[in-house]
């Protein structure tokens, strides 16, 4: 069910183009949480706090994109298996990361999404 005045084919194309963006943002949120949980070292506190802000933003943005997909009459697909199936992003290392490593990794991921 669509809530748009766009022609159906146009709405479908726009929704299809938004789907990968939504998955990227969900993945950024999850990767950010992994970094948040594993950051250590001298700059732990400021990095940990900055990650909270970024993670919240990525989650809200993914929600906004998903809602736009719905408005266009499509079903958003944002399950973990959808992220895996689409091959979104590189895996974050499962390791303790110092602040610079965590932020560098996330900066690279953000750049790949942008």
Please give the residue ranges for each predicted region.
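Disorder-to-helix initiation segments
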Residues: 1-21, 99
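Short, exposed beta-strand "edge-strand" segments with a Pro/Gly-rich flavor and a Y/T-containing core
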Residues: 1-6, 70-78, 90-97
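Helix-loop segments that flank and shape redox-cofactor active sites
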Residues: 5-13, 28-53, 75
């Amino acid at each position: 069910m669509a809530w748009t005045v766009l022609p159906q084919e146009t709405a479908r194309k726009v929704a299809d183009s938004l789907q990968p963006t939504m998955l990227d943002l969900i993945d950024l949120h999850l990767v950010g949480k992994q970094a948040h949980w594993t950051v250590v070292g001298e700059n732990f506190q400021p990095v940990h706090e900055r990650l909270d802000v970024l993670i919240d933003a990525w989650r809200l943005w993914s929600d906004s994109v998903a809602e736009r997909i719905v408005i266009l009459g499509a079903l958003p697909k944002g399950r973990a298996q959808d992220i895996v199936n689409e091959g979104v992003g590189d895996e974050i290392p499962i390791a303790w990361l110092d602040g610079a490593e965590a932020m560098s990794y996330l900066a690279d991921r953000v750049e790949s999404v942008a």
